[in-house]
Every structure is written in C-alpha cells, then in structure tokens.
Regions:
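Positively charged n-region of N-terminal signal peptides that target proteins for export
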Residues: 1-5
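Bacterial Sec signal peptide processing site at the extreme N-terminus
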Residues: 11-36
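Second-shell loop/turn segments in exported
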Residues: 24-28, 48-56, 104
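...with weaker cross-activation on analogous glycine-rich loops/strands in unrelated enzymes
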Residues: 27-29, 74-133, 139
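Active-site nucleophile-His-acid catalytic modules used for acyl/amide transfer and hydrolysis
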Residues: 41-58, 76-78
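Active-site nucleophilic cysteine motif
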Residues: 56-69
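Glycine- and charge-enriched low-complexity intrinsically disordered segments
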Residues: 138-152
Length: 152
C-alpha cells in the first residue's frame, strides 16, 4: 500500500510540473509583417523621389509600394491609380498592417499619393522630399487628403 501511495504521489508530482502549452496562441502575422516592412522602409530611407522610378536608386510612391509588397510576396499593380482601382476596399477603421492608403495630394486625375499602413494610426510612404518616412495617418495634412484604402 505504501508503494502504491508513493507511485501515485510521483505521478501527481510529474503531471503537476509538466509543461503546459497554450494551443490557442498564434504569433500575429501582422506583427511579423510590420517588422519586415520596417526593415524595408529603412532600406529605402535615402531613396530620392523620381516619378516613374521603381528601385531603391530612384522611385515614386507607387513604385515603392509595389516593390515593398513584392518583398512580402504580394503582387500589386504599378501605378497609384491602378493600385487604388484594384484590391479589396477597406474602411479606415478596419486598417491592418500592409494595407495601402491613398490620398488626393494634387490636381487632375493623377494627383494622388499612396503609402502602406503600419499600425497604431501610422503609415510609411516615399516622400516627395525623398526617402521613406513613417507618419501619422490622422495628422491634419494626411487626414484632409485621405481618399481610401485597399487590401491585397
């Protein structure tokens, strides 16, 4: 009897000290995507803005978004207008890391700008002043010019 009590005690001790794995935990894909986008943004921080460009040597806003998302294995059209015209429409309140955000910044049909939403109300974009910058989506400048978002 003493031997059985000892074995039962050992079993309870071992099971009580066993490793518990939370099977409901899944690392956030968006967190990983955001980290990757930050690395990409850093690589493009000195890229001059040149209309029609698509490389780190020179690019425009949609060339940057196309190249950045391609590094995440997401294929999108080349121009701001075609990027806005495709993808799935997303409301501002439902933005997720990697969504494209669009702005009316100039005159005419091509006076648009595009960036990539990060999180916490921030997005990255290739600035016309040169280099990729992270800025607040709800700053007075960008908030007044916001026209929509797309998810790919």
């Amino acid at each position: 009897m003493r031997h059985i009590f000892f074995i039962i005690t050992i079993i309870f001790f071992i099971s009580g000290c066993s490793f518990y794995q939370n099977l409901n935990y899944r690392p956030s894909y968006n967190t990983n995507k955001e980290a990757r986008l930050k690395v990409i943004a850093n690589e493009w921080k000195k890229t001059p803005y040149v209309l029609g460009g698509t490389s780190k040597k020179r690019a425009d806003c949609s060339g940057f978004t196309q190249s950045a998302l391609a590094q995440l294995n997401i294929r999108i059209p080349r121009t701001t207008k075609t990027q806005l015209g495709s993808g799935r429409k997303v409301s501002k309140s439902k933005l997720q890391t990697g969504d494209l955000v669009f702005f009316k910044t100039g005159r005419g049909p091509n006076g648009m700008h595009v960036g990539i939403y990060m999180s916490k109300g921030k997005f990255i974009h290739l600035s016309t002043k040169g280099g990729v910058k992270e800025v607040e989506l709800n700053s007075s400048y960008w908030k007044a010019r916001y026209i929509g978002a797309r998810r790919y």
